[in-house]
Amino acid sequence: MSFHLKQVTRRFGKHTAVDSVDVEIPQGQMVGVIGRSGAGKSTLLRMINRLVDPSSGSIHFNDTEVSSLKGAALRAWQRDCAMIFQQFNLVPRLDVLTNVMLGRLNHRSTALSLFNIFSHEERLMAIAALERLGIEHVAMQAAGTLSGGQQQRVAIARALMQSPKMVLADEPIASLDPLNAKIVMDALRDINEREGITVITNLHTLDTARNYCERIIGMSQGRVVFDGTPAELTAAAVTEIYGTDSQGSGIDETMTSTSINIPGAQLAARPVQQSAGPEPLALAGL
C-alpha cells in the first residue's frame, strides 16, 4: 500500500501555499515535515485529510483518488486518515472518556451517532486507548481541566479509536514542554511501530525530526526542497529549508530545538501520578 501526492498545489487568492508537491509514501513510514512557519506544512496535511481541497494535482491512496471523494466516501477517508491538531480539538465540557469515544462516530449508524450512544465494547476500547497513553485515571474528568500534554494524549487516544490507516499530526508538540513533547512523540512512534500505521507529522524542530522520523521532508515557500533520511539532512540541506539569518549566516540548529532529550531523565518510563478515587472502569460503568 502507498500514498501519493501528484503535483499538488494549493492557492489562496494570489498566494501559493503549496506548490507542485510530488511525494510518494509507502505504508508504515514515519515521516517528519519540517520548515519555517508559512512553509506550507499545515496546508499540506489539511489537503491530505481533505479539510482543504487542492487547487490542482491529485491525491491517491492505493487505487483510490482521495482528492475526488465526496459524501460517504469522503467521510470514510477522514475516518481512515486520523488527524491530530496542535490545539487538541477536544470538547472541553465533556469527560475524557466521551471525547475519546467520539473517534468512533464515523464507524456507526447516523441514529447512534446523533444520540452519542456508545456500546460496552466501545467503552472498553476507549479505556484501553487511555491506558496505553498512561492517562486512564483522568477518564471521567472534563477534558478542559487537563494540562496541554494530557489533552494531546487524549487527542491521540481519540485518533486510535478511529482504527486509522494513517495518522496526521499537525505540530503536535508546538505548545508542549519538553517532558510532554517526548511523551507525545513516543506515543506517535509506538503507533507507527506497533500497528505499522503511516504517521506524517509537521515539526518545527530538527532534533525531533532526526530522533523520531525515518524520513524527513523539508519545505520552503510551499515547495519540497529536501526529501531523505535524517543522515542525509546536512547543514547545506538545513540552510535550503530554513534559509539564512539577516547577516546571511546559516540557521543555528539550537533555534529549532525543543531540548526534547533531557540528560539522565527517564521520561518515557516515569510513572504518571494517579489521583485517589474509584478506578476508571468503575467510573465508566464497566
Swiss-Prot record:
Pfam name, any one: ABC_tran
A GO cellular component annotation in the UniProt record: plasma membrane
Span of domain ABC transporter: 3-246
EC number: 7.3.2.2
One annotated GO molecular function: ABC-type phosphonate transporter activity
Function: Part of the ABC transporter complex PhnCDE involved in phosphonates import. Responsible for energy coupling to the transport system.
Subunit (UniProt): The complex is composed of two ATP-binding proteins (PhnC), two transmembrane proteins (PhnE) and a solute-binding protein (PhnD).
Designated name of the protein: Phosphonates import ATP-binding protein PhnC
Biological source species: Agrobacterium fabrum (strain C58 / ATCC 33970) (Agrobacterium tumefaciens (strain C58))
Upper taxonomic lineage: Bacteria, Pseudomonadati, Pseudomonadota, Alphaproteobacteria, Hyphomicrobiales
Name of the coding gene: phnC
